Amino acid sequence: MNELNNGFTIFLSLLVEAMPFLLLGVLLSSLLLFFVNERKLVEKMPKNPLLGALVGSMIGFLFPVCECGNVPVARRFLIQGVPMPVAIGFLLAAPTINPVVIWATWTAFRDQPEIVVLRVVFSLAIATIIGFVFSFQKDLNPIVQPAIARYMKYNPPTQPQTKGRGKRSQVQQEATVLNLLQSGTYILGGKAGIPLRIDANLVPPTLISTSDKPIAAKLRLVVDNSIQELRELGGVMILGSAIAAAIQVLAPRELILSLGAGPITSIVVMLILAVVVSICSTVDSFFALSFASTFSSGSLLAFLVFGPMIDIKSVGLMLSIFKPKTIFYLFALAAQLTFVFTLFLNLHVF
């Protein structure tokens, strides 16, 4: 009975902590939809996969979301035609590479500024490498969920319009953007889950460009779309929080902590602990600070770098974009790179 009470308390704390950031991510996703010209966004993204992954990793400075809110924004990037390396880089690095988290880490480790610097450097490096690795997969069908793949197939990123193109191309662009406004925004393709065929003759008269709407109408659409996505993602977040709480209660934490003495085992323990506790990146530095006297600096960095990338609460959200095999590869690559980087620190630096 005591474990049940503890589990319920942890579940509520995770949910209360995560929901505001999920709401922020959904709101940013809606703002991207209605106020960002996706054609210009795609045009400005680097075509080089390595540079694109690096740029995507640094976008977190502009969109300060944690691991609870980065998934909706990364999904919006993908369906707006942003290259996969950019989206992957943002997905993995945004929870760490943002001003709020950097400030919180500096506050916690004021006496160890190298922790702050290395957390940013390692997060950028790992996200860039993984994004670059995924750039070799040209066909996205094996990576993303079928609904995402269908949408990207029927709504390819718009190209700069040439003089020889008529009004049909412009109408298609407007329909492509506003296709996301229908019911089932997050699932894609409306109530039936079927992508809308983009054809100038089939565009309803209500689908007019958002650029022609007044600010009040745009804001109303932003609110409506945010409510729709929050309703669809909230249930997934609740399930993920419940799983994370169950793991925290049932996992033998005393055994895990007792293994944190060696340079290798301490990193493994903190990697496992990062997955188990599923704490938000805005406050995880204070949690890691409590282990500073017993764990090596490399293992603390492993917790601070790997934790925001791999959060149990967000696995359900990621499954709405990627297939399970893709998420496994993301997790495995992130764990291996984090282990190698932090082990080098434990053996040769600290």
Where are these regions (language model features)?
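Hydrophobic transmembrane alpha-helices of multi-pass solute/ion transporters
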Residues: 1-18, 162-230
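Membrane-embedded alpha-helical segments and adjacent helix-loop junctions characteristic
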Residues: 1-75, 218-277, 286-287
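Transmembrane-helix boundary and interhelical-loop signature of multi-pass inner-membrane proteins
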Residues: 12, 33, 37-42, 108-109, ...
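Internal alpha-helical transmembrane segments of multi-pass membrane proteins, especially GPCRs
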Residues: 16, 20, 46, 89, ...
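Alpha-helical transmembrane segments and their lipid-water interface positions
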Residues: 20, 24, 67, 71, ...
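Alpha-helical transmembrane segments of multipass membrane proteins
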Residues: 29, 33, 63, 126-134, ...
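Juxtamembrane and boundary regions of transmembrane helices in multi-pass small-molecule transporters
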Residues: 46-47, 111-202, 317-350
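Membrane-interfacial helix-loop connectors
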Residues: 62-99, 103-121, 248-326
